[in-house]
UniProtKB/Swiss-Prot annotation:
Annotated pathway: Cofactor biosynthesis; coenzyme A biosynthesis; CoA from (R)-pantothenate: step 4/5
Coiled-coil portions: none
Major location category of this protein: cytoplasm
CC terms in the record's Gene Ontology section: cytoplasm
Organism listed in the record: Mycobacteroides abscessus (strain ATCC 19977 / DSM 44196 / CCUG 20993 / CIP 104536 / JCM 13569 / NCTC 13031 / TMC 1543 / L948) (Mycobacterium abscessus)
HAMAP family, per the entry: PPAT_bact (MF_00151)
CDD domains xrefs: PPAT
Name of the protein: Phosphopantetheine adenylyltransferase
This protein's encoding gene: coaD
Role this protein plays: Reversibly transfers an adenylyl group from ATP to 4'-phosphopantetheine, yielding dephospho-CoA (dPCoA) and pyrophosphate.
GO biological processes: coenzyme A biosynthetic process
Amino acid sequence: MTGAVCPGSFDPVTLGHLDVFERAAAQFDEVIVAVLINPNKAGMFTVDERIEMIRESTADLPNLRVESGQGLLVDFVRERGLNAIVKGLRTGTDFEYELQMAQMNKHIAGVDTFFVATAPAYSFVSSSLAKEVATYGGDVSALLPASVHQRLLGKLRGQAQ
């Protein structure tokens, strides 16, 4: 059995992320989306909210599950008996950073990283950009799953009060 991890903060999950998850699920027997906890970053959504949004958005992928994790990604991968990391790439800048991480993960743990070129429709999409545009009243409904978009709007309304 082959298995892979799709790591990230997913604050919130975007359609670009879902594209990568679906493509990974088509290539691997088991895929775990790892919602990584960074104690130095305060997210808009809690880790539990992010996990719930991803689960709702990936319910049609039976070989995919969602977990949280912290610490070294390769430890997360090894503890679950998996053998690969899948990362989406939007730009050459993404590649430069992710290649260094992939080489380090291979060096310290022998874990391979597979890069998936983001679909052109999502090449500009990021969680940060979606949040920023939505904060100023811009329409980001085409960038997020519908339920995630509604949650984002709810968070922003709550902050305005």
